[in-house]
A protein has these predicted regions:
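Catalytic core of pol beta-like nucleotidyltransferases
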Residues: 1-34, 38-59, 69-132
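Short, aliphatic-rich beta-strand segments
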Residues: 64-68
C-alpha cells in the first residue's frame, strides 16, 4: 500500500488533509483511513464537461475513503454526515471533490483479507494509507 499523496494535485492534497483532520478530530475509534479508487490509482478526473444533445453535463471523480474503526460503525456514520457538511462548507468557494466513505470494523476488514475478498485485497494493492 502506498503512503504518500504527493503525486496528487495540490488542491487535492489540501482537501484530503482537511478531511483527514476532521475525521481524526471527530472519530476517536478510527484506526485507519485509506484512500482507494480512482484517486489512489491515478486515473481520477478533476473536472470534465460536455454538451451532448444540447444538454450540458459535467463529471468529476469523488474521494473513495475507507475508515477502519473499532466499536459501532453506525455511530461513526452519523458523525461522517457532519464531517462531510463541514468539509463542503470549508470549500464552498471552489469546485471540490465529494468524499464517499465506507466504514468497516477492523475485525470485518481482517476477516475479508484472510479470505482474499476482492474489494479489500484491491484496496491493499492500490490504496493510499492516509492514517494508521
Amino acid at each position: 500500500m502506498k503512503k504518500s499523496i504527493k503525486r496528487l494535485p495540490k488542491c487535492t492534497q489540501e482537501e484530503l488533509t482537511v478531511l483527514l483532520d476532521l475525521v481524526c478530530k471527530s472519530i476517536g475509534n478510527c484506526q485507519m483511513v485509506i484512500l482507494f479508487g480512482s484517486y489512489a490509482r491515478g486515473n481520477y478526473v478533476l473536472w470534465d464537461s460536455n454538451i451532448e444533445f444540447g444538454v450540458h453535463t459535467s463529471y468529476q471523480s469523488d474521494y473513495d475513503i475507507l475508515l477502519v474503526v473499532t466499536g459501532q460503525t453506525k455511530y461513526v456514520e452519523r458523525k461522517l454526515n457532519r464531517i462531510t457538511n463541514k468539509y463542503h462548507d470549508l470549500f464552498a468557494d471552489r469546485r471540490h471533490a465529494f468524499p464517499q466513505f465506507v466504514v468497516e470494523h477492523i475485525n470485518t476488514v481482517n476477516r475479508n483479507l484472510e479470505i482474499s475478498q476482492y474489494f479489500f485485497t484491491d484496496i491493499v494493492k492500490e490504496g493510499i494509507m492516509l492514517y494508521n
